[in-house]
Design a protein with these regions (language model features):
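GST-like fold's C-terminal all-alpha helical module
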Residues: 92, 101-197, 202
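GST-like domain detector, emphasizing the conserved glutathione-binding G-site
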Residues: 1-129, 146
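Conserved histidine-centered catalytic loops in small-molecule metabolism enzymes
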Residues: 206-210
Length: 210
C-alpha cells in the first residue's frame, strides 16, 4: 500500500478515509491517539508540524518519490489531483469545489469544533457565553449550506472533495447540538452520501486503538 493515513476518529480524519475509499486507493491507517498526546510524538510532528491530524505519506508520490501532506484540505486536494477524481479538470469547474472546500476548512469546522470545546468546559460562565456564540455561528453556517443545496445534489456540479470535507463535520451534528431536521436540504444531502458503500467503509475503518 503506497499511502499511510496518520489519523484518529475525528471529522478531519474521517473525511480523508472517506475520500480514499471513494477514490479506490489502497491505504493503511496509522492511529495517532490524540487523547494520549500522540500528535506530539516527534515522528508525527515531522509529518505535521502544527501538529494536528490527519497527515498522509504517499510512497508513490509525484515522479515516483515519497511525499507527505498535512492539513485535511491539502490532503483532499492532493488526492484529487493524484487520481483525477472528484475535482473537475477545467478551472471553471474547480472554482465551486475550492470555494466550498475553503468554506469548510475556514468556517464549518472551527465553529462546530468550538461548540464541542465549550460543551466540555466545567466553568458554567465560560461555557454559557462560548456555547451561545459558537452554536449560533454553527447554525448560521448550516443555514448557508441549506440554502445552497436547495435543488442541488452536491456542493459543486458533481460529487467532489468539497462534499467529503463537509461530510466529516456534519457526521458529528448531534454532538454539536444540531438537529438536521432543521436543515432539510443538508439532511437530504447527508443521508444520500451516507448511503454510499465507499462512504460507509470510510467511516467504518478503525481509527482508534482496540
Amino acid at each position: 500500500m503506497s499511502i499511510t493515513l496518520h489519523s484518529f476518529d475525528t471529522p478531519n480524519g474521517r473525511k480523508i478515509s472517506v475520500a480514499l475509499e471513494e477514490m479506490g486507493l489502497p491505504y493503511r491507517v496509522q492511529v495517532v491517539d490524540i487523547t494520549q498526546g500522540g500528535q506530539h510524538d516527534p515522528a508525527f510532528v515531522s509529518l505535521s508540524p502544527n501538529p494536528k491530524i490527519p497527515a498522509i505519506v504517499d510512497s508513490d508520490g509525484p515522479a515516483g518519490r515519497p511525499v507527505s501532506v498535512f492539513e485535511s484540505g491539502a490532503i483532499l486536494y492532493y488526492l484529487a489531483r493524484k487520481t483525477g477524481q472528484f475535482m473537475p479538470a477545467d478551472l471553471a469547474g474547480q472554482v465551486p469545489v475550492l470555494e466550498w472546500l475553503m468554506f469548510q476548512v475556514g468556517g464549518f469546522g472551527p465553529a462546530p469544533g468550538q461548540v464541542h470545546h465549550f460543551i466540555a468546559l466545567s466553568n458554567e460562565d465560560d461555557k454559557r457565553y462560548g456555547l451561545a456564540r459558537f452554536t449560533a455561528e454553527t447554525r448560521r453556517l448550516y443555514g448557508v449550506m441549506d440554502s445552497h443545496l436547495a435543488g442541488r445534489d452536491h456542493f459543486a456540479d458533481a460529487l467532489s472533495i468539497a462534499d467529503f470535507a463537509v461530510l466529516g463535520w456534519v457526521w458529528r451534528h448531534a454532538r454539536h447540538q444540531v438537529d438536521l431536521a432543521d436543515f432539510p436540504q443538508v439532511q437530504r444531502w447527508y443521508q444520500t452520501l451516507m448511503a454510499r458503500p465507499a462512504v460507509q467503509r470510510g467511516f467504518a475503518v478503525p481509527m482508534r486503538h482496540a
